[in-house]
Amino acid sequence: MKKNNNGKLRIIPLGGLEQIGMNITAFEYEDSIIVVDCGLSFPEDDMLGIDLVIPDVTYLKENIDKVKGFVITHGHEDHIGALPYVLREINVPIYATKLTVGLIDNKLKEHNLLRTTKRKVIKHGQSINLGCFRIEFIKTNHSIQDASALAIYSPAGIVIHTGDFKVDYTPVFGDAIDLQRFAEIGKKGVLALMCDSTNAERKGFTMSERTVGKTFDNIFAEHKNTRIIIATFASNVDRVQQIINSAYKYGRKVAVEGRSMVNVIGTAAELGYLQIPDKTLIDIDQIKNYPDDKVVLITTGSQGESMAALSRMAANIHKKVTIKPNDTIIFSSNPIPGNEKAVSRVINELSRKGADVIFQDAHVSGHACQEEIKLIYSLVKPKYSIPVHGEYRHLKAQAQIARDLGIPKENIFILSSGDVLELNEEEPAKVKEKVRTGAILVDGLGVGDVGNIVLRDRQHLAEDGIMIVVLTLEKHSSRLLAGPDIVSRGFVYVRESEDLMDEARIVVEDAIDVCLDKHITDWGKIKNIIKDSLGDFLWKRTKRNPMILPIIMEA
């Protein structure tokens, strides 16, 4: 691709920085934009009732004529989960590897978007041309198969985006990471490297996925007489393959529970990414037909999600599986930051039921540690370092690695979502401006209709409850005709607080009298006076601040 010394490449992260999840980055050159990944994140503890969080793509909507397509690095939720929501407004083609497209197809089917969305399967080593860009897919290793790094060729220079990766010389399925190709591109001259920062604080190398297979073999050998239940990420197909291998080796049938687990395993097996021996896989309803020591159950719930299968088993509300004393339960994952309490709660519930819970040594990370990050930098030799994928401390740790490897401080950019980094070979790179970004909250079928005000109301209700005041006023004079009747929910138990309720009614009546004395007849003002008077009274009596909702009827 011919270089243009005057034009500038604009790199615009719209999510995924200073947080875990919601990865999405736009690359813009003149009249062309490509979007790398389009992921979701899961709600914080204080986002009551929220199911998912997706990125605000206002910038893409404002420049929709420039957007040429979504280029996806791999099939994890934090990289593909927002696609069904964003595609409704920005319907452009999707380019990804075979398994990634298969997992995206599952999502598009759920949202009735399969027929209207163009998908193209790209092989590792292949390139695609989108507007001013050429994008090459490079084989990497991760905790899901078919993961890719991207070499993005633009008139301003080459940018390498690693996606999520690790260096695994002995992967369970397929080839090792294509380090040779990284080196070859590095010799051409790389303008910038955008590298996975998740494990940038961890020294050494990430262990191979195959080591987990040996751990499973040891656990299966030591627990020959018990039922084994294993919780892991649904998308970790290599992990599932090793569980199946150990189950087959020790003569156990395998059942799968959890909607996402069933979907991913079905897709991976159909596309040839899972090798399941004949008659090994059974339906969850069939496990009762086999002795406990002949069954392995692979389930969702490794992160303590309240509605996941393992959590429902722990709470005795699963319809098909009841935890038994001496069950062996393996957590084949590490808690994502923020999920530690939920995971601990599930482990405690399972332990109370007599299960033997194993949550150590049955997991390896899918992300590169410091020595692997250094290796990629050494092969690529970028002019600029742009750490991505992680909280601020992770990005900062990678920035230090880049400094240690000789990249000047002024050539290292720790970006925030919305920053517009402009760069080319000739002029110093700089953050030029900031575009609108943010989080769009998904609650049931509602996308974006729950904002900060609604969340604040939900938090208020959760903390102090609500008090509803119902009264009837004479239309013209605003004289009290009936009530006030007070209904309380989540504040106090009315039957045990009758004196408080009686006093509250008197406070409301006094507030109405004040309005009459001052000739206040505007109902909005009357409601505010009731709220202020009653709120002050309740705070003095209880040191609580319930939401107060006056309802006025006229007669």
Where do the model's predicted regions map?
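His/Asp/Glu-rich metal-coordinating catalytic cores
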Residues: 2-71, 76-289, 308-322, 341-344
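Conserved beta-strand scaffold positions in the cores of enzyme catalytic domains, especially
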Residues: 11-13, 119-121, 192-194, 329, ...
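A glycine- and charged-residue-rich anion-binding loop/surface
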Residues: 17, 41-45, 49, 66-67, ...
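Short glycine-rich phosphate-binding loop at a beta-alpha junction
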Residues: 93, 386, 549
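Conserved hydrophobic residues forming the short capping helix/wall of the S-adenosyl-L-methionine
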Residues: 108, 402, 538
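Hard-cation-handling environments
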Residues: 202-332, 336-503, 507-519, 527
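C-terminal tails and terminal domains of large nucleic-acid-associated
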Residues: 519-555
